């Protein structure tokens, strides 16, 4: 480790006069222009447009060499030992021991001490007991692999009375031991002088920070720390979050010392804090920097705010919001020594004035910009009126860009950042981990994409502790602390393991599994498109009236019916259905080889049985499939799909209990028989049931549904397969379920449980054992739930193996966690918390785009059910309501199909086809590859991109061996007789030809003979 703080990144040296022209060119092309106050307002316009999908998702890259990786803690939150070894009382000791909490305080909840009184407030008396566990804490640092550790010195521990005098030797010894241990580990300290815990003696004697005299006491305390510890400390923080200290300590009273004063008092305290900070900076700069070589700053917290509407007024309000929180302290220090103009204009009677000498004294008193950004400081303690009716957002990247523009490109050290989980959450803190990932990724984007000079990042905090106004109701540590235990052992959470891996890799380096694969699919690969319910329009394009009419030309100018005269009934043809040909044309334009759609059971059999058959609808479907075959597109037909109303069932069956009624299974088998009989000559791929949704289906309904599928399969297998030579299976929705915490065995078990309930419930009886998954049965039995029916041995034999291929629909990936964090998304039935990685790209309907989930679910199915032929029967994403340029879908298809290729080539998955969802926006709004507007279908960019992939049969590259695929021709089933009997056909043709020639000769010579006779 270097002995001194790393130097600032080098700036270009001033060029000589002889290079003045070059200076101008470099200044325009390379040097960053000087920023001025107010320039930060450009940030909102810059980020107003959504980023391209490839930029919005996972960002791969590493941080600059020498980047500072830190973790932090604060004295009162973690040290404990509040009366040990001569420590004086702080304002937080007094504040937490007070029986009445201020308004909005929740510290009484979740008291860790186990005290019987529910009204006893939580305190930091013991907290994480860091005062007695230096080795324990530093071992945690070693596990993380951080380069820096931020901690604060308890003012009352080194100076019990707060003022200069004889320091507390035991307090000094504790911090020396900590610093020495850090030196042994090669971890550099980042030391905060004041983290909210003012000695109570100074509060009583002077009224705390409301008294200007406190600045001198703070200077004396800082001098003591610089003298005793400065040789080992290269980064100093004077005051942590002066906004919270001033506003919530002295104006709202939400935090210690709990003074519910006027806003004027809050602004006065902030004024004194700025002067106190400046005094300490000048002290270090004059007396200690020459020998110690460190840097000093102040930790400023901020929120981020977005305009309700992208108007000049809303943007000005956002700028004002940041001025009132961050700019309140940042502008005096980093710009000109005075408050933001927006504050002075709005608070002229409340805001104290700086003298000219004070402005000069405060200006420039920071060697780097120390930024805090987190839930408590940036959001929970943000006064509502300081939002100015705009929308706060946890967007760290935008804030970093704003600071860069507003304060002239400072070096930024993020000295506090993180999130929180519930106080009941133990070590699987998935929510915290993904927020940590999001914030670090946004920091990397700010560095790489926006050019912001961020030099370090601090995760908050090292361990669970006392969380100020929230007490112990939340946890923010990377290490878990059992506050009820005597030992207070630190146990790494998932977030700690994640942070350790991230530091080890210095960011998010590109991983081999995330790289696209070049290659092509087999020649007979099925490229399909899905339209769950095609446009059924039985209106004929020709006249169907059999009557004869005369045109009354001379009088009424109308058609007059001729009574008693009718024409012969005209035979109907498929071309009569006007709606079919436009759909066929669009499919041909897409170059797909297969088209999947669902039949409407309720339209074909309105009563659910063959007592009333809609032959017109059947003729329409028959024409649809025959026309598809004619143009060499293979129809893939689903018999049933759950859809409102009536779950896609005939109304009578729905009223009689739907799938709860065993009779529905028998009715389905008869319906299937009719469809096979009427359509089977043209349909070679059948789906019995498409995506039966297991999450809202009862066990008895699922039981009957499985039997219905099996009955239909056996009908086809025994009565139609030999003549029609088709294949039949069921299509199951198979979204991937990923453990939220990849390091947690419990989360892995939870993920497997959900997969069995979501997919295995219907898949295991068909593709596996013939019975329900044992995981499912065992879980329900443990909870005394005996509603899952049992199959008889005959039923198992009936159901098992009723497939010719495995068809799955896949759209997204869901994370599951064993910890109950969000009651709204918690599934009590399966004891699982569903969540998402907030760094994932999402569609407008908040469906996560996770391409690698498709590959994982394909491998899971292969592992569970063997090397079966598989079809991805549906895969797609929604776009914006008026999105003509559907770049999200282009990105989605490109990456999901590439993952399918990886599964086929790298994993040996027997993948036979891919079907994109959906055909058009008319039948599936916001999902279509064709846009429907003004009664016309217009191709979206995604359709053209899909066509390109189809034409290439995948993703061929320079290293890919070209695969020759012979062109396929339409097979005419009606002409098969002639194809198999070519010699006979030739002989008949010869006889016909000879007959014609003979007839011609006879005619010729007979005519010639008549002429001669005449």
UniProtKB/Swiss-Prot annotation:
Keywords noted in UniProt: Cell membrane, Glycoprotein, Glycosidase, Hydrolase, Membrane, Repeat, Secreted, Signal, Transmembrane, Transmembrane helix
GO molecular function: beta-glucuronidase activity; fibroblast growth factor binding; fibroblast growth factor receptor binding
Positions on the Extracellular side per record topology: 36-983
Highest taxon listed in the record's lineage: Eukaryota
Annotated region (Glycosyl hydrolase-1 1), positions in chain: 59-508
Region (Glycosyl hydrolase-1 2): 517-955
SUPFAM superfamilies: (Trans)glycosidases (SSF51445)
Record GO cellular component, one term: extracellular region
Positions on the Cytoplasmic side per record topology: 1005-1014
Glycosylation sites noted in the Swiss-Prot or TrEMBL record: 161, 285, 346, 609, 614, 696
GO terms, biological process: carbohydrate metabolic process; fibroblast growth factor receptor signaling pathway
Signal peptide feature range: 1-35
Residues annotated as transmembrane: 984-1004
Enzyme nomenclature, EC number: 3.2.1.31
Catalytic activity: a beta-D-glucuronoside + H2O = D-glucuronate + an alcohol
InterPro entries for this protein: Glyco_hydro_1, Glyco_hydro_1_N_CS, Glycoside_hydrolase_SF
Record remark: domains: Contains 2 glycosyl hydrolase 1 regions. However, the first region lacks the essential Glu active site residue at position 241, and the second one lacks the essential Glu active site residue at position 874.
Entry function: May have weak glycosidase activity towards glucuronylated steroids. However, it lacks essential active site Glu residues at positions 241 and 874, suggesting it may be inactive as a glycosidase in vivo. May be involved in the regulation of calcium and phosphorus homeostasis by inhibiting the synthesis of active vitamin D. Essential factor for the specific interaction between FGF23 and FGFR1.
Subunit and interaction comment: Homodimer. Interacts with FGF23 and FGFR1.
Family label: Belongs to the glycosyl hydrolase 1 family. Klotho subfamily.
Name under which the protein is recorded: Klotho
Lineage of origin: Eukaryota, Metazoa, Chordata, Craniata, Vertebrata
Gene designation per UniProt: KL
């Amino acid at each position: 480790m270097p002995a001194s703080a790393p130097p600032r990144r080098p700036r270009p040296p001033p060029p000589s006069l002889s290079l003045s022209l070059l200076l101008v060119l470099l200044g325009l092309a390379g040097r960053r222009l000087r920023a001025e106050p107010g320039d930060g307002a450009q940030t909102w316009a810059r980020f107003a447009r959504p980023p391209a999908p490839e930029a919005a998702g996972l960002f791969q890259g590493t941080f600059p060499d020498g980047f500072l990786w830190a973790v932090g803690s604060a004295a009162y939150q973690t040290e404990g030992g509040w009366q040990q070894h001569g420590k004086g009382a702080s304002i937080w000791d007094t504040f937490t021991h007070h029986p009445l909490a201020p308004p909005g305080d929740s510290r009484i909840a979740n008291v860790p001490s186990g005290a019987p009184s529910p009204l006893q407030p939580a305190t930091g008396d013991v907290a994480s007991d860091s005062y007695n566990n230096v080795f324990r804490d530093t071992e945690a640092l070693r596990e993380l692999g951080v380069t820096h550790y931020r901690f604060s010195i308890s003012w009352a521990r080194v100076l019990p009375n707060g003022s200069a005098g004889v320091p507390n030797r035991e307090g000094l010894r504790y911090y020396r031991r900590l610093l020495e241990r850090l030196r042994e580990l090669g971890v550099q300290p980042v030391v905060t002088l004041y983290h909210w815990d003012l000695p109570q003696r100074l509060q009583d004697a002077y009224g705390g920070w409301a008294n200007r005299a406190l600045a001198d006491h703070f200077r004396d305390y800082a001098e003591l720390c610089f003298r005793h510890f400065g040789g080992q400390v290269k980064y100093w923080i004077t005051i942590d979050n002066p906004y919270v200290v001033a506003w919530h300590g002295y104006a709202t009273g939400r935090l210690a010392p709990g003074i519910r004063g006027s806003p004027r008092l809050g602004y006065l305290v902030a004024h004194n804090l700025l002067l106190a900070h400046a005094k300490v900076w000048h002290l270090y700069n004059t007396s200690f920097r020459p020998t110690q070589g460190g840097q000093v700053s102040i930790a400023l917290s901020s929120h981020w705010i977005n305009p309700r509407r992208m108007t000049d007024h809303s943007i000005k309000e956002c700028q004002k919001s940041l001025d009132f929180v961050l700019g309140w302290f940042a502008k005096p220090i980093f710009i000109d020594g005075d408050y933001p103009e927006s504050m002075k204009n709005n608070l002229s009677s409340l805001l104290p004035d700086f003298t000219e000498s004070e402005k000069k004294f405060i200006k420039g008193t920071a060697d780097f910009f120390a930024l805090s950004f987190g839930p408590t400081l940036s959001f929970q303690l943000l006064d509502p009126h300081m939002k100015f009716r705009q929308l706060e957002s946890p967007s760290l990247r935008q804030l970093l860009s704003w600071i860069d523009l507003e304060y002239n490109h400072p070096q930024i050290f993020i000295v506090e950042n993180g999130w929180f989980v519930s106080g009941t959450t133990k070590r699987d803190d998935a929510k915290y981990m993904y927020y940590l990932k999001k914030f670090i990724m946004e920091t990397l984007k700010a560095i790489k994409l926006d050019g912001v000079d961020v030099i370090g990042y601090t995760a908050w905090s090292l361990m669970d502790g006392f969380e100020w106004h929230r007490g112990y109701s939340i946890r923010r540590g990377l290490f878990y602390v059992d506050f009820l235990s005597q030992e207070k052992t630190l146990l790494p959470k998932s977030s700690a393991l994640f942070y350790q891996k991230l530091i080890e890799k210095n960011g998010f380096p590109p991983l081999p599994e995330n790289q696209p694969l070049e290659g092509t699919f087999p020649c007979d690969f099925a490229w399909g498109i899905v339209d769950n319910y095609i446009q059924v329009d039985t209106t004929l394009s020709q006249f169907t009236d059999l009557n004869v009419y005369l045109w009354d030309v001379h009088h009424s100018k109308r058609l007059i019916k001729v009574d008693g005269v009718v024409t012969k009934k005209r035979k109907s043809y498929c071309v009569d259905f006007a709606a079919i040909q436009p759909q066929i044309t669009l499919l041909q334009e897409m170059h797909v080889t297969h088209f999947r759609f669902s039949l409407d059971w309720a339209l074909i059999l309105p009563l659910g049985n063959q007592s009333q058959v809609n032959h017109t609808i059947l003729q329409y479907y028959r024409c649809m499939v025959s026309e598809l075959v004619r143009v060499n597109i293979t129809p893939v037909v689903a018999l049933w799909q759950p859809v409102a109303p009536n779950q896609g069932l005939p109304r009578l069956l729905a009223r009689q209990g739907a799938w709860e009624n065993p009779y529905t299974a028998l009715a389905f088998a008869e319906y299937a028989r009719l469809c096979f009989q009427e359509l089977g000559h043209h349909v070679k791929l059948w789906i019995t049931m498409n995506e039966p949704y297991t999450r809202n289906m009862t066990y008895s309904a699922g039981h009957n549904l499985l039997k219905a599928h099996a009955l239909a399969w056996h009908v086809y297998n025994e009565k139609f397969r030999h003549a029609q030579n088709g294949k039949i299976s069921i299509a199951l929705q198979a979204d991937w379920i990923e453990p939220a915490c990849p390091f947690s065995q419990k989360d892995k078990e939870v993920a497997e449980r959900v997969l069995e309930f979501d997919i295995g419930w219907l898949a295991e009886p068909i593709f596996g054992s013939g019975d329900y998954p044992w995981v499912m049965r065992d879980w329900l039995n443990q909870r005394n739930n005996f509603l899952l029916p049992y199959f008889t041995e005959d039923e198992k034999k009936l159901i098992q193996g009723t497939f010719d291929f495995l068809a799955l629909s896949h759209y997204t990936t869901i994370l599951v966690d064993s910890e109950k964090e969000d009651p709204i998304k918690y599934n009590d039935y399966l004891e699982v918390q569903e969540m998402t990685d907030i760094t994932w790209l999402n569609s407008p309907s908040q469906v996560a785009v996770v391409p690698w989930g498709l590959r994982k679910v394909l491998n899971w199915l292969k592992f569970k059910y063997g090397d079966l032929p598989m079809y991805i029967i549906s895969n797609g994403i929604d776009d914006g309501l008026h999105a003509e340029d559907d770049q999200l879908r282009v990105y989605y298809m490109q990456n999901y199909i590439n993952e399918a290729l990886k599964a086929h080539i790298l994993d040996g998955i027997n993948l036979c086809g891919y079907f994109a969802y959906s055909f058009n926006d008319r039948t599936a709004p916001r999902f279509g590859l064709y846009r429907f507007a003004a009664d016309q279908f217009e191709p979206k960019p995604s359709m053209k991109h899909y066509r390109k992939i189809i034409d290439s049969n995948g993703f061929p590259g320079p290293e890919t061996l070209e695969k020759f695929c012979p062109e396929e021709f339409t097979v005419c089933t009606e002409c098969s007789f002639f194809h198999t009997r070519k010699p006979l056909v030739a002989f008949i043709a010869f006889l016909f030809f000879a007959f014609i020639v003979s007839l011609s000769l006879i005619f010729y010579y007979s005519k010639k003979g008549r002429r001669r006779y005449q």
